[in-house]
């Protein structure tokens, strides 16, 4: 049944979109203010971004400890904001019964912010830390250089992020501009608010009316039109001028077809030639009929860039001549799949921007025509308009039912009625050839992963220590088809995948690079030395003969399980059971070589499986103090977090910090001081945490991941048991757990981009 949608305008001018989606477990709000960095005075670069930060520092009515961020985080929700060129977005997702509290805090902080000078001073340092990280990030600098190349007259080429020197806090003119920007743009006529959740439309409307009346009445302020966008010299960057309304949605359709890498498409042609290494398409700017978008294409060393560009122009011409109704029909099927798989937060954000998951309307089709006409074209290449991807089919694949392997556990924690299935397969690969052969499998699975991404199916192939893992999740029919194809590719990779691949993955900021290495670090195994050799299918066949596997499925109904049995007939390796969890003694420090110059550290403190409930509550109670002390008081940097995490089946406290000026040893001291300070049990926080582990309140993917991690830990996967354990956790339980964690002999893992600070840590370089 399609979602029920209601749109209306409130008395203060605020535009409201409400979406009732009964399948959702959570509710979300997304608020867009039609003003961004290009609308701020050019004299004060970063003013709009700075104001966005200040909103989150609390107000007299809702101080920081009870503000939107803490409120949402305490409920296990998501919250964030983003300042773009001509708009600023605020959004959060929470359990349905908490939507009103979140919306009240959001509207109050935006309508009546506290812009005190002392908090401005502190937050300016956070902005400056972001600026330093941005200036050191190669990817960010490449994009900035691209924007600067557009036009010297267009504001796209200017600096808008802000730093310590552009935000002149003690200049009266700056303070006047800051207050004036808020008064001019943060009023009803400038705001679009969307609410989305399982609640009836009338309830959503009541909540919206009750809180949105905080905004002053106003009319839409005409935003200054930018100068023209000149044509770009780059073959992969495109500018458009004077496009009709609906052009952003039309570009989404075009990119959806560009991302199709099956034979007969542009990416398919590049892949057939062995040239394609990596591809992403990104809309960089859209406003007042202007569009700027870019194709980030990485080709092999032997590729011909001119031929790749010529093929692209040939494909543009083909799409321009294709039946647009047929294009739109297939796009509609893709959008329907995306909408069904989207979270409440994704749906609300799309609604707030006027870009719901839907096919093009009449205006959008006209915009598509104008967009295609403004693209270069050539009579070059052999192209096809392909049929609908089978991954979008809702019916189960036809196959003779087969019994499920004994190595596959069936979890009952995710009801089939959710229409979300997850499958985890894990292989123990002791062979020294696992690392080079892993790269072969990564290349083999890449085209299928691209198709899965388009069809809103998760397909992830990963490794940790001596283990390979395949994870697939989404609509049950799509999961079955994707897994069957994935296993076939893992058994017999195409010939092109055996060639050496020299493409490097995109560089990550230090803290994200450490998070990527964390599973390997927990496993504690270094990759074996492998002599250079030519890889062959025979080596892979031999590897599979000496490999053991086990897995877990969740969310499949009986008929789908029978089809899953057929799909797993070709699962390589011998069935087994989960391996013992990794363990280590005392404090272990791992020095990771990652790109970037900022100090970064992850501290992982494992806990016994029986202490999961107390550990989760302890992590919840530490989250606020960690953020307050490290991010707000000490201003170590903008990347600060703490949480309970399960990694390779091992549950524990995880702390992460990236700082441009405070080294790892100092960060560690601050964390230890926080732990020594202890926590005080808050019954309300305990109740809220327990509520997060009620299946109807958990995201489907989170239920499946929790069940899998619990399976790896060889524990019983019962959410009701975890909830009861949380509710019965006492202050003494938390005190004893903290005392055990602080014992010098406790098993800690510190993963950092620096050497151990002293000999109390057992060091290791990677």
Swiss-Prot record:
Active site (UniProt): 52
Protein EC: 3.4.24.-
Entry keyword Metal-binding: yes
GO biological process, one term: pyrroloquinoline quinone biosynthetic process
Record keywords, A-Z: Hydrolase, Metal-binding, Metalloprotease, PQQ biosynthesis, Protease, Zinc
Gene Ontology MF terms: metalloendopeptidase activity; zinc ion binding
Cofactor note: Binds 1 zinc ion per subunit.
The protein's annotated pathway: Cofactor biosynthesis; pyrroloquinoline quinone biosynthesis
Sequence positions that bind Zn(2+): 49, 53, 130
Cofactor field: Zn(2+)
Gene3D superfamilies: Metalloenzyme, LuxS/M16 peptidase-like
PROSITE patterns: INSULINASE
Family assignment from sequence similarity: Belongs to the peptidase M16 family.
Role this protein plays: Required for coenzyme pyrroloquinoline quinone (PQQ) biosynthesis. It is thought that this protein is a protease that cleaves peptides bond in a small peptide (gene pqqA), providing the glutamate and tyrosine residues which are necessary for the synthesis of PQQ.
Name this polypeptide is given: Coenzyme PQQ synthesis protein F
Native species: Pseudomonas putida (strain ATCC 47054 / DSM 6125 / CFBP 8728 / NCIMB 11950 / KT2440)
